[in-house]
């Protein structure tokens, strides 16, 4: 402007060069899990990519999640993981479970915290998510007023940028214990 003042508008655009990320998740990938594609470990599921990182990890690991719908229950236990989607409306991590849904692994109800589509455990310090939709796709209609959590975050120093949370009831659960700090930024 003529008065010397400048107004800046902030846009959250993720542009990662091939050196900007460590792992790729692509729902259309049909090769062997963890195989190198363009010098990057590549997986078809977020869970496989997350589980490829050691729980003793000490350095930031950036996972690029390509546009797509990933129907899976994800638990993050390793520190310093970043999940970066290509587009917050086109990169969707979803699961369908409520507190009364039977967990096929245990035969018991998930419970409220267990219904989460994504759980960030307390040891997953420094977790970040950017340009994603985290959704619990449970439909309450015809069911009894059940909680269906999209994100259960128990970790300290978590940051969520341009991340959409979609759920029916109790969408976001900040679930840290009283004795452990859990600074979470949304």
Q: What is each of the regions a protein language model found here?
A:
Residues 29-30, 68-69, 87-89:
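Acidic glycine-/aspartate-rich tracts in secreted/extracellular proteins
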Residues 51-56, 71-83, 93-128, 138-156:
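Extracellular beta-strand-rich solenoid/capping regions of secreted or surface-exposed proteins
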